[in-house]
A protein has these predicted regions:
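Bacterial N-terminal signal peptides that target proteins for export
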Residues: 2-14
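Bacterial Sec-dependent N-terminal signal peptides
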Residues: 3-6, 19-46
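Catalytic-core regions of glycoside hydrolase
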Residues: 40-85, 140, 218-226, 230-376
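Aromatic-lined substrate-binding rim segments of carbohydrate-active enzymes
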Residues: 91-176, 241-260
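Conserved, mostly hydrophobic/aromatic
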Residues: 102, 204, 217, 423, ...
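Active-site groove signature of glycoside hydrolases
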Residues: 173-238
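Catalytic cores of secreted or luminal carbohydrate-active enzymes
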Residues: 352-409
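Extracellular/luminal regions of secreted and cell-surface proteins that mediate adhesion/ECM remodeling
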Residues: 396-533
Length: 533
């Protein structure tokens, strides 16, 4: 299988904002390499050992629990009040204290009720717009990022999930009946549908292609439940399958250049089937097509032993640490009930354990707290009341948790002199920090800083270009030696510090280090005092 590979040779520009940025040279070794020991034997250096923080929630990008919401009629306007006073097996808790993201999943017609009219615009006051603002404002107040999925297919729904203006413009589609209600869905290969949907996604990206606010955008919005399976094409067969996949994947990759995009690695991706054991090679090829355009991966049937089985596990293994994984459980307590016994589960506590175990096997970065309009039942309630230990265990062990257990730095240097620093990094989580996805393009880097001893602000920053955070996986520490000159550094007393910076934001801290002590308010890890002569 051809895996996506990314080579980044970027020159770091010098930015004099709050600090002077200086680059140097470095070399590295895996920790189990015997040559590593020589990297620590540096005259004039002191070796600083760091204790890890293993349990605290870290709101680092693309990891953690995803809190599900929505903008349909089932969403209550007091959602945040209910979730801030949520029942758990250990008493009342605030759900946001355990999550990193609010996931807003909704009908295209709710996001875009009229042509050119969107619920994020000022003055739009539909019920979905009111719910949307409530969720977005509440997320901001609680330090959560946003994530989105759009659904265009109306099957199993009680109203049209594609806006009426699309049908009125002449898009072709089909009718189905949900209960006593007839609903209409467009054919995904219809050119008018594609034109209108492309305009919606373009306008959405103009607003939300912003990693400071948005965690990810998930799926194509096509097929049953928006999960990219059971599609119905105008041809009556799967002939348009490849062309439609090429169209929508290229469109999203072009629009979302800064925010991760995610595709469901479904065995029937973009086909007319919901489940099938044939044609798996073609499905794999289509998923790879998306991966190679920069898509990350998700699946929506974790814990369901039929719909997530050997093929899904095998495909996930081929992409392990090449793309991050987001999981969603498949079983729904309110609708599936006793069906879980067919998978060998006696109750939903066992379902939660099954989902957790499957997620760990796939090295997922994010797990789901799905929504139910009755907060006293459903998946989120189940996690917090029958498996609260697993909620906390995922925070401690899932995703990525990065820290340098050992750093060798000089305690006395001369201005303009050469510095040699050895540093070793570990990942305590089972996932990985996906700096190799094109939307990030290795923007997160290791940096060392000379901090002002009074303010603890960086005066000089030195970015080590060589380490790739995506290479740090559990059980495989990475050691590096970084050499640079203190050209232009004024003499004085400073504090050595290390941080994981965002090079697109003037080297501000971008990822929290998982250290127990010694972190500044901004996230720099203090190492030792240093005198520059």
């Amino acid at each position: 299988m051809k895996l996506f590979k990314e080579i980044s040779n970027r020159l770091l520009s010098i930015a004099l904002v709050s600090s002077l940025i200086i680059t140097g040279t470095s070399c590295s070794d895996d920790d189990n390499n015997s040559g590593t020991n020589n990297l620590w034997d540096i005259s004039g250096n002191t070796v600083v050992s760091i204790k890890p923080e293993r349990y605290k929630l870290q709101r680092n990008p693309l990891q953690g629990w995803v809190i599900y919401g929505g903008i349909g009629d089932g969403m209550m306007m007091n959602f945040w009040d209910l979730y801030d006073n949520f029942e758990s097996s250990e008493g009342q808790v605030r759900v946001a204290d355990y999550g990193t993201t609010i996931y807003i999943r909704g009908a295209w017609s709710d996001f875009n009720p009229e042509e050119g009219v969107y619920i994020w615009q000022d003055g739009v006051d539909t019920k979905p717009a009111q719910r949307f603002r409530m969720l977005v404002n509440g997320a901001k107040e609680r330090g959560l990022k946003l994530a989105f999925t759009f659904v265009t297919d109306s099957r199993d729904k009680h109203y049209n999930f594609t806006p009426e203006y699309v049908k009125e413009a002449g898009a072709q589609g089909f009718e189905t009946t949900t209960g006593s209600v007839k609903v209409w869905s467009p054919y995904p290969d219809d050119p008018i549908f594609q034109e209108k949907y492309e305009q919606f996604l373009t306008d959405f990206a103009a607003k939300y292609n912003n990693p400071d606010e948005v965690q990810f955008v998930s799926g194509f919005g096509l097929g049953k439940w928006g999960e990219t399976h059971t599609l119905k094409y105008s041809t009556g067969d799967d002939t348009p399958r490849y062309a439609v996949t090429e169209w929508i994947s290229s469109l999203m990759a072009r629009l979302f250049t800064k925010v991760p995009i995610v595709i469901n690695y479904h065995r029937c991706i973009m086909s007319g089937k919901e489940y099938d054991n044939s044609g798996l090679e073609e499905s794999e090829n289509l998923i790879n097509l998306c991966v190679n355009k920069g898509f990350s991966l998700r699946h929506d049937a974790f814990g369901m032993k039929t719909y997530y089985s050997n093929w899904e596990r095998g495909y996930a293994a081929t992409q392990r640490f090449n793309r991050p994984f987001i999981m969603e459980g498949g079983w729904v307590e309110s609708s599936h009930g006793g069906s879980i016994k067919g998978d060998g589960y006696a109750n939903f506590a066992e379902v939660r354990q099954g989902e957790f175990d499957e997620a760990k096997g796939a090295n997922v970065n994010m797990m789901d707290l799905r929504f139910d309009s009755n907060v006293n039942s459903g998946e989120t309630h189940s996690w917090f009341n029958t498996a609260f230990n697993l909620v906390k265990k995922f925070i401690a062990e899932g995703g990525y948790r990065l820290y340098p257990d050992k750093v060798s730095v000089p305690t006395s240097v001369t201005t303009g002199g050469k510095v040699s620093i050895t540093h070793r990094w570990s990942n305590l989580g089972w996932g990985y920090c996906p700096t190799n996805i094109p939307q990030w393009n290795q923007k997160y880097k290791v940096a060392f800083a000379l901090l002002d001893k009074t303010t603890e602000q960086p005066v000089y920053t030195f970015v080590n270009e060589e380490p790739r955070l995506c290479d740090w996986v559990h059980g495989s520490p990475k050691t590096y030696n970084y050499q640079f000159s203190l050209t232009g550094v004024n003499s004085g007393e400073y504090i050595w510090a290390v941080g994981l910076v965002d090079t697109t934001k003037d080297n501000a801290i971008g990822i929290e280090i998982s250290a127990k002590d010694g972190l500044t308010d901004e996230g720099w890890l203090k190492l030792t005092d240093v005198t520059v002569r």
